[in-house]
Amino acid sequence: ETEKEKEGYTKSVKTLLKDCENNQELKKGVEGVLANLIDVPEELQTAIEMSLGMALQNIVTETEQDAKKLVEYLRKNNIGRASFLPITSIKGKKIENIKGNKTGIIGIAADLVKYNKKCEQIIYNLLGRTVIVDNMDTAIRVAKENGQNFKIVTQEGDIINLSLIHISE
């Protein structure tokens, strides 16, 4: 990863990534930061970024033991905190179907991003119950038609989740 790619990460994530680059044993079992493991179409970047929030900085590891090793390293070196997504333990579920009028629905977020197949359960966990729509009117309609059983995000990044509406800046 270049320094430019690390912009916006918390200090502890930046430090951990840098240390992994210089220490092969530490790096073993580390897939990378979630933001670098998904490919998002340009027109959906705001919606996906809002959907994922801070999870974009989560570090994907092969196993729980790999995550544990990194947690111990963070503590031992007083680096700070980071969140981890072990491939072997994360399970996700994707929405089966969206009821009602499909007009304005762009799709299920997990289907709209590209990723390595081995990260599929992580993507389903984080984006499998999120629907991306074109605008707020569609979001409100879809929420009513589906009983708000999932998160709805507009292309502009506004979020409707259960009875909460979050407007992005």
Label for each model-derived stretch:
Residues 2-169:
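Hinge-like oligomerization/junction regions that interrupt long coiled-coil arms in large cytoskeletal
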